[in-house]
């Protein structure tokens, strides 16, 4: 479902466990204030905003069930076609549309195939949205 406005969470990019990087999908791990009311966990198409620029991103909000389940919700964004370091930067993460629920994958290969599909879906959604 489309929200009437873009839901946005802001925070500082911190070092995560670099698992995304290890499989070719580096993500910005955003540490956000605990008082945010969060949307449901899952994968979203959206944007990461900093320096007054908006970058297309595949966003994952959730518990990282494939690698090691976390109780708190982690917020990670894979910025499309982007390779700068953002550690320590204050960024906004804007959610445009829900793509799918979070799920546990039984292999890295399956996870990678799904992430590639998620990126295609993200591009398609954001293209329609602009």
Language-model regions, residue ranges each:
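Phosphate/ribose-recognition catalytic cores of enzymes acting on nucleotide-derived substrates
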Residues: 15-130
